[in-house]
Amino acid sequence: MEKYLSVVKMALERGIVPRCHFEDITRADFYGFVVPFAHALAGLSEEAGIPIKIRCCDTLGLGVAYPGASMPRSVPGIIYGLRHYGNVPSSLLEWHGHNDFYKAVSNAAAAWLYGASAANCSLLGIGERTGNCPLEGMVMEYCSLRGTTDGMNLEVITEIAEFFE
């Protein structure tokens, strides 16, 4: 942890706004490592007056979106825990999920619902192994949750898919 923090500190000293990736968070020691690491980053951020974003990476797609799922695989628990035990504001939390077990959309939606301000996506879910969270899936999830398209033209999803074919 100290080596990572020293790199973040050097970046902050040079005025760089860091985004720290909490890789493999769904297999990590959440309370023994993740929360203390978030606290240490918050201290550096406060000292430098520069916000530090935290990207929660479900590196192997092992996250579980349902309330009550056990840690460290619980997406609601991870986001809730970082917000309430790690004191990380929603505006500095983002979710980066992989689709190895076809849960990328439900996990990203759970991260949103529990307070992450962003979910990383790719067109058609294209990415390593079985892919990332498909942007078009999250667009549909957003519309379902909000009850509106908010002016988005959903017809372009078909056009994009046809272009990629």
What do the predicted segments below correspond to?
Residues 1-165:
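Catalytic cores and adjacent flexible loops of soluble metabolic enzymes
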